[in-house]
């Protein structure tokens, strides 16, 4: 009996010791886990605090620069002297408005020096390009100015500049304008039936080469077979002069009354390329024409001189 009781007591002591050991191990394991978890939380808190400080610093920088207006870079700038602040420390807040004012004044001066011709007629064959920069279009639209138009000449027209410079130098002329680029048709060189050189309005690169009084003369005589038109003198490369008449019929200008002599003397034929230029010489409208094998020039007689002349003299030229 005593042995059995001792065995039971020893077994109970062993079990209690095992329970205590297991509890101790479990408690230590839990404490170890809690301690490691606390360390991880501290590291995460430190990283989060650093990120927060960096974000706050960047936010302060952005808020600081948000109060400073950015400089706008327009396509074109026309600087003007600042009389209010000669040291150059002008306010940047008024910069866009100052740019608009300066650019608007520039185009206003340009239009004042070279006013648009009210008689100008657009033609689909003209080579025209426009400024398309958004900043410039916005400024021009806000200030009420039309977009400037730039005429682009063809390669043939550009190659003739050297010759035109010499012609204008000899004649002391100015205001050179390209009017027409055309290939002569059969009707332009037939001397038996037509006897005229036609210039259709839709083929004109520029239709503002006539003065108002010259244009009114041609408009009054439109669809009139007995019109005198505007007298002209045609000069070829041999300095030989020919009397011609500039007329209008419908939507065409014509050179007649002497054109047949020009065709025969210069041996013009269908297929020859013609470039016609206009310029002013002492206030008189002049033209310069060049074809494949030669150079032709003619100058319009002032309309007042033509009106003073009798109709019989004009018919005699034909």
From Swiss-Prot:
TM spans (from-to): none
Protein name according to UniProt: B3 domain-containing protein At1g05930
One Pfam family cited in the UniProt record for this chain: At2g31720-like
Cellular location(s): Nucleus
Entry-linked InterPro entries: At2g31720-like, B3_DNA-bd, DNA-bd_pseudobarrel_sf
CDD domains the record matches: B3_DNA (cd10017)
DNA-binding region: 201-293
Annotated organism of origin: Arabidopsis thaliana (Mouse-ear cress)
Keyword list, A-Z: DNA-binding, Nucleus, Transcription, Transcription regulation
Domain of life from the UniProt record: Eukaryota
GO cellular component: nucleus
Molecular-function GO term, any one: DNA binding
């Amino acid at each position: 009996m005593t042995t059995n009781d001792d065995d039971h007591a020893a077994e109970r002591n062993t079990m209690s010791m095992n329970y205590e050991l297991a509890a101790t191990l479990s408690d230590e394991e839990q404490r170890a886990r809690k301690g490691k978890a606390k360390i991880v939380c501290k590291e995460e808190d430190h990283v989060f605090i650093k990120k927060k400080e960096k974000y706050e610093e960047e936010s302060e920088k952005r808020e600081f620069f948000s109060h400073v207006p950015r400089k706008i870079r327009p396509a074109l700038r026309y600087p003007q002297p600042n009389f209010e602040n000669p040291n150059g420390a002008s306010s940047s807040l008024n910069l866009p408005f100052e740019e608009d004012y300066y650019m608007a004044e520039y185009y206003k001066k340009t239009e004042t020096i070279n006013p648009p011709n009210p008689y100008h007629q657009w033609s689909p064959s003209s080579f025209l390009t426009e400024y398309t920069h958004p900043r410039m279009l916005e400024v021009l639209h806000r200030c009420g100015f039309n977009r400037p138009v730039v005429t682009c000449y063809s390669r043939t027209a550009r190659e003739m500049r050297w010759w035109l410079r010499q012609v204008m130098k000899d004649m002391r002329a100015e205001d050179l304008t390209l009017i027409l680029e055309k290939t002569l048709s059969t009707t332009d060189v037939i001397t038996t039936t037509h006897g005229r050189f036609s210039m259709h309005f839709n083929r004109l690169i520029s239709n503002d080469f006539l003065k108002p009084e010259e244009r009114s003369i041609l408009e009054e005589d439109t669809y009139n077979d007995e019109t005198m038109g505007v007298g002209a003198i045609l000069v070829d490369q041999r300095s030989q002069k020919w009397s011609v008449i500039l007329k209008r019929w419908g939507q065409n200008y014509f050179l007649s009354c002497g054109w047949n002599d020009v065709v025969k003397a210069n041996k013009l034929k269908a297929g020859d390329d013609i470039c016609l230029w206009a310029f002013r010489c002492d206030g008189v409208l002049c033209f310069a024409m060049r074809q494949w094998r030669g150079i032709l020039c003619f100058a319009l007689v002032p309309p007042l001189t033509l009106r003073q002349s009798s109709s019989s003299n004009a018919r005699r030229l034909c």
